[in-house]
């Protein structure tokens, strides 16, 4: 069923309360994005941003199809939007695309330990490179998720082995220079 879009006169009303109410029926992502950045009233801007995020996350009955939302996310790499979708998007596919755009180590750790979907937990884990972070993930997932725990331990052990190997090579080079 087609949802009723608000009349443009409601969206252009000088009354912020009327514009705010009209946003609840608006599903045009471009228009919401424009209102979120340009409306004179901060409450209307915040409501437009909230509606935009809700639609992109797939939490509204009138959300666009997943393919459209995936494309929009790939085009709009706003860190706040990416973070919102990573935590609130309905479909794991959308959260996975958001994860690909995330660089914050703390967010990657949180997803690796707490996300309800195994694929996202493992994908987040693979993006973590710091030994301390891998150790934290291993400790926090030890009794909850054996696959994540094992993979974190494997990666941590590999990093430690590489560090030992590099230090051994450096020591050998120093010894050879001293001959």
Question: What function would you assign to each model-found segment?
Answer:
Residues 1-179:
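Alpha-helical scaffold segments
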